[in-house]
Amino acid sequence: MSFVTTEIQDAVAVLTIDRPKALNALNPEVLADLKAAFEAIDQNAVRCVVLTGAGDKSFVAGADIGSMSTMTKAEGEAFGKLGNDVFLMIESFPLPVIAAVNGFALGGGNELAMSCDIRLCSDNAVFGQPEVGLGITPGFGGTQR
């Protein structure tokens, strides 16, 4: 099952992170699906990309803490590297990438929105890096964007 859906409408690729029950939280599978979705975009047929989250509660509520809690040190390092690589790919994508932020954009979700060129926000958009309050450095390049 893919956690990222792609729709092409009038030369606009709409990528939707589709885990609304988990508030679209990021885990290795979501990041791999997001990477694959960007790599599959036909840059000759598409003029821009809109990235959003399914449901109305959350763009991306951050990393999937449940998934992270079972990772070994090596798996955690690989997860951080994958997230950083995917976000750098989005940041340097040759087409404009627009984050359509609906609800929470926390932690990795805020970092994901920051990796996009433009952020369009609903009235209920909330941004933050709550991990810094726990003494944890943002893992996907959020201190550099």
Question: Which residue stretches match the model-derived regions?
Answer:
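CoA-thioester-processing core
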Residues: 86, 90-92, 100, 106-145
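Hydrophobic/aromatic residues within transmembrane alpha-helices
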Residues: 15, 51, 64, 112-114
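Glycine- (often His-adjacent) and acidic-residue-rich active-site loop
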Residues: 53-89, 105, 135
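Conserved CoA-thioester-binding segment of acyl-CoA-metabolizing enzymes
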Residues: 1-52, 88
